Amino acid sequence: MHAPLLLALALAAGSTPRTFRVDAFHTGNATEERLALDRLVLEPLPFPGNPDRPVDDLNLGKYLFEVRDLASNRLLYSRGYASVFGEWETTAEAKEVNRTFHESFRFPAPDRPVQLVVRKRDKRQAFREIWTLTVDPKDMYVDTSSPAPAGTVIEILKSGPPERKLDLLILGDGYTESECKTFEAQARKATDALLAVEPFRSRRGDLNVRALCPPARESGVSRPSTGVHRNSPVGAAYDAFGSERYVLALDNRRFREVASQAPYDFVAILVNADTYGGGGIQGLYATVAAGSLWAPYVFVHELGHHIAGLADEYFTSDVAYLPGERIEPWERNVTILSDPARPKWAVTPGTPIPTPWDQADYETRAKGFQEKRKAIRKRNGPEAEMDALFLEQKKVESEKLSAEPYAKKVGAFEGANYEAKGAYRSEVDCIMFSRDDVPFCSACRSALDDVIDQYAGAPVRTAPSR
């Protein structure tokens, strides 16, 4: 960001505090974990969060961090979140080895010492303390240096000051300087896709969207399964946790240095690649292969994970995670339906719970497509072949699901959250379930609305919801 823009943002913020960041290492395995301080950072920009909602009351996330006044123990700020470690610890690899991942905690810069408290959900979904750290904002080791310039911030949608809007930052990764115009076009296309669906369509007045393209020395990002390695500015790469389509940026320090140059509550990373892929972690970032035919869909789907902690509603695709103990998920769009008389969300009157649908036929078809997909990847087939398969799958599944007796009704449809049995979603089809041309389901929209409220306050609606 150019110096005049930095100054303008600082002046516009008035007394808004700067953004303070605690960088930490998160180490462990499937059964144990610990956190350790890396460094304290005072970021260059004011804190973008809503000053009227500093304490998180949404009960989302596998983890929760709190910032408390050291002298009085008064709660000053909190946020629920998920993390790379929190996902990795559920993989088979975590049963065999220890690994360390880097993560950050951002909050309004305090004017006196505070206590950072990190909590994690236990088996009953209650948050239990796992780490504390005393933070003195006047410590001589607080890093106040300016990050290396990452380019000029592009204003895609400006609806108001950062502290009164939900601020989405779109970062490019793997774009050379000559390709940054391509990135900008892709970022605008992705934004259009987001604003075409509810609740974002009717709440565009509650959003700011900015983009930033740090120039890469080489075009593209890493894809280890094909022998491709790139030292890209944000460090995004395919094959996370051994899943060929899962794209993560594991160099959190590098990611934060780039992102700190624009106001953000949430971040989407567009990777310069054509191969289908992406990822989304609540409160961390979303990723998408911007050159893929399916980029608009993946962008919206992964932001569902990132912004509102929405669970995947599908149950037939291969994932790296191992099944866990059956407890009610904290995610708002899935349930184990422990009490059918009291479902997790409002149900369409007259809809039976559980809600019948032809799951067996769907599952047979879906698994057939999965086998074809694996075969294409195994022989490194062209992406056009994968696109054709996905288009065929979309046609078949759209026709099937739209013809279900309870299509477009809110109920409890079995099959969700990677589980074919015992887990339920609110509608038969949804952006979090398939690549079909459908909206977010009712449960997803409600969760997303609540998060937008948290950052932007009362809704500024520009069109009616569905």
List the predicted regions and their residue ranges:
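Fold-level signature of zinc-dependent metallopeptidase catalytic domains
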Residues: D139-R201, A211-V221
